[in-house]
Amino acid sequence: MEKVINQIKPRTPEEKILIAIIQQTMEDAFELSKSTNLSMAEIQQSRNWFRTKACEIICDHLGTTQDHIVKLYDKLSEKYKTGQINQTQLRFAIRRLELKI
């Protein structure tokens, strides 16, 4: 059986910024941002963002699909809500998101 090794693709500065946008939006959606006081409306807006045209455009630039990002978000959300992962593990997963894109 062969082992699959995940390697980080070399990313352009633009791609790094786009990945950071997705990561920050996920942190906001999960209320992980400690440096900002987000209102519930802003948190809900972050949660809804993954199903918007803006997200689709960013995904296209990154060579992935919006559906893939939504599935990643939904999977993390389910694991976090059911206690399978804690806040620290969730934050770690979001920071390593580029490995999944």
Where are these regions (language model features)?
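Charged interaction scaffolds used for protein-protein
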Residues: 1-101
